[in-house]
């Protein structure tokens, strides 16, 4: 039994470090215990306080599996942060795809791309394919290196140095 307890607290310590919980003694840890009524369970406080506002509360079920108990407010904030992070990641991927195709006016290409994304019903969009499509439909928004005229035998570097 002592070995099991040490194993439990090692797992809690590892999770606490990952969650940047400074004071592990303040961490509320509960244990779910069986009850004579099969429709009920008992919660036993193993560590911390019932009045603790620090989240998450850690709960061990009867099989020793560790669960986290959060308030709806905290869960809602987490979901909102995940949504914002996903949105930011998508915007960065779109920005990278646009810049790889040498836009003359980044914001014009961005606006066209956002309109295309709004029209599309796809949840997983291929931004490179989207920008290629925009480039074929609106070539005036992009720099085409073929349009740059250099005399035969000249290079971009030697032209700039002159």
Swiss-Prot record:
InterPro entries: UPF0763. It holds the Pfam family DUF2603. Belongs to the UPF0763 family. This is UPF0763 protein Sdel_0383.
